[in-house]
UniProtKB/Swiss-Prot annotation:
Quaternary context: Homopentamer.
Name under which the protein is recorded: Large-conductance mechanosensitive channel
Lineage: Bacteria, Pseudomonadati, Pseudomonadota, Alphaproteobacteria, Hyphomicrobiales
Family membership noted in the UniProt record: Belongs to the MscL family.
A UniProt-annotated Pfam family: MscL
Highest taxon of the lineage: Bacteria
């Protein structure tokens, strides 16, 4: 069973998938940093809400008087929409970057295909040539 597992892991597609997951996780951290460190402070400043959306919430209970989300959750029910805004912007940026990457790959692939000169058609096999000659000779006799 251990040998089967080694064979499974050693296959190319499993290794490619593992590399893709690792690169995806690292890329996700980069996008998180772009959103949290670059985009959200600008959006927060433009909306007049400061630089941090994580403490944006609506109290659902009259007992909630706290100013931070953590303290408000201890006091009662809250509708914490600030983190959702951050995650949604993160998703939009990630989706846009993936779209641009796929567009770039498709453009490069199309460019390579256009550069390829069409290969001349291979001559028909010898047996096809002989059969064609026989057919032509039979047509002439008829």
């Amino acid at each position: 069973m251990l040998n089967e597992f080694k064979e499974f892991i050693a296959r190319g597609n499993v290794m490619d998938l593992a590399v893709g997951v690792i690169i995806g996780a690292a890329f996700s951290k980069i996008v998180d940093s772009v959103v949290n460190d670059l985009v959200m402070p600008v959006v927060g400043a433009l909306t007049g809400g400061g630089f941090d959306f994580s403490d944006y919430f609506l109290p659902l209970s009259g007992n909630v008087t706290a100013q931070t989300l953590a303290a408000a959750r201890e006091q009662g029910a809250v509708f914490a929409y600030g983190n959702f805004i951050t995650v949604f912007i993160n998703f939009l940026i990630l989706a846009w970057i993936i779209f641009l990457l796929i567009k770039l790959v498709n453009r490069a692939r199309a460019s390579v295909e256009r550069e390829k000169a069409p290969e001349p058609a291979a001559p028909p096999p010898q047996d096809i040539l002989l059969l064609s000659e026989i057919r032509d000779l039979l047509k002439q006799r008829a």
